[in-house]
């Protein structure tokens, strides 16, 4: 007999840096999950992914055990990294006026690579559609897509 699911918890955490402080502790604590076990498991699985933000969906069962699925990083995070917008000295989120002020550039080749990476979590199987979706996200952030 399968275990009974008591809840799902969705979080976005920096790779390799999960700790029991908020938001992880309170979110998992209210479901009775062993917080340190999750943090150790998540950190060991994501240690090689650098400073990317990793969305994770945690399934909590009635016996307080859990499993989790890691998704690909958000498109905006991947685009910022590709455009070179986020550095330690100058953290940036994009343009405040994306239709007037452009803050970076990505090439079609970079966009294609990002779309291929992101396709497993998107609702399309067509690479062109995924590229258009990524280009729209870039445009709304004030990032130019160049040939």
Swiss-Prot record:
NCBIfam families assigned: L11_bact
Biological source species: Sorangium cellulosum (strain So ce56)
CDD domains the record matches: Ribosomal_L11
Modification note: One or more lysine residues are methylated.
Alphabetized Gene3D superfamilies for the sequence: Ribosomal protein L11, C-terminal domain (1.10.10.250), Ribosomal protein L11/L12, N-terminal domain (3.30.1550.10)
Family to which the UniProt record says this protein belongs: Belongs to the universal ribosomal protein uL11 family.
SMART domains reported in the protein's UniProt record: RL11
PANTHER family: 60S RIBOSOMAL PROTEIN L12, LARGE RIBOSOMAL SUBUNIT PROTEIN UL11M
A GO CC annotation given for this chain: cytosolic large ribosomal subunit
Keyword Ribosomal protein applies: yes
Keyword Transferase among UniProt keywords: no
Protein name per the record: Large ribosomal subunit protein uL11
